């Protein structure tokens, strides 16, 4: 049975940067207040008319180039997003068309900030089962369009961006284990319950979050799933080289690192400059650390994501 291994990574960030200082001109907040509570210093915003598929496509091109393959060899496209271009069809088919891959299976996965981990595990299962040999997995969001810019509790948190990986079959190593979980009992602590109905938008069109409840849930859930993911692969905390976590809040990241007994210089943190990009955050962070040389071939990585639903997931892999 083949492994699924990361052949290449890629990412894309929109040009517009919104700093905390600039944000403080819109709502009652300060740079110091935001940094002390979240670790975020700035975030990227998609331009007017720039869609999630535009970000996803650019990240995909960079991942394909890094993998050193022809796009035509890709046999599946999965896009994790909460902010699709439209209700339907999927954002994945838009990316598929732009890549010129007619006929290749393409679909979206919606698990909010855990979306990339769900898409990653799905692609891994297809490769492990021998159904395909290569998959393009993308996390892309324009979450800034779901934000109430008058609500300082949420407008400080989110940014736009996309990250992608190409997975390929490998006989020697790759993804060692994955774990996915969800608990709908906590669906109301982080949500955006808007929905189209008879030509109008019903429900609240903006993100709502109970910050303290989310923090409490996330810290325990991420610690627990890390233990399970390591155990499934016969590994321990001491074996880990890197943690690549969802970039939501620095205190959550630090709590996970402490649980894993990892120093922070072995944790990939892009939160200060990216903010929370939801499904894009894990592949964005991974690509940043691969491209700057921190993460090297053969190292053992733990990837983790968690978001509304509640849904969370992880993967242990040799890069």
From Swiss-Prot:
NCBIfam families registered for this protein in UniProt: fabH, PRK09352.1
Active site: 113, 246, 276
Cysteine disulfide links: none
Role summary: Catalyzes the condensation reaction of fatty acid synthesis by the addition to an acyl acceptor of two carbons from malonyl-ACP. Catalyzes the first condensation reaction which initiates fatty acid synthesis and may therefore play a role in governing the total rate of fatty acid production. Possesses both acetoacetyl-ACP synthase and acetyl transacylase activities. Its substrate specificity determines the biosynthesis of branched-chain and/or straight-chain of fatty acids.
Gene source species: Laribacter hongkongensis (strain HLHK9)
Keyword presence, Lipid metabolism: yes
Pathway(s) of this molecule: Lipid metabolism; fatty acid biosynthesis
Example GO biological process: fatty acid biosynthetic process
Main EC class the enzyme belongs to: transferase
Assigned protein family: Belongs to the thiolase-like superfamily. FabH family.
Record note on quaternary structure: Homodimer.
Keyword Cytoplasm: yes
Catalytic activity: malonyl-[ACP] + acetyl-CoA + H(+) = 3-oxobutanoyl-[ACP] + CO2 + CoA
SUPFAM superfamilies per record: Thiolase-like (SSF53901)
GO molecular function, one term: beta-ketoacyl-acyl-carrier-protein synthase III activity
Keywords: Acyltransferase, Cytoplasm, Fatty acid biosynthesis, Fatty acid metabolism, Lipid biosynthesis, Lipid metabolism, Multifunctional enzyme, Transferase
Region of interest called ACP-binding, as start-end residue ranges on this chain: 247-251
Protein's cellular compartments: Cytoplasm
EC number(s) recorded for this UniProt protein: 2.3.1.180
The protein, known as: Beta-ketoacyl-[acyl-carrier-protein] synthase III
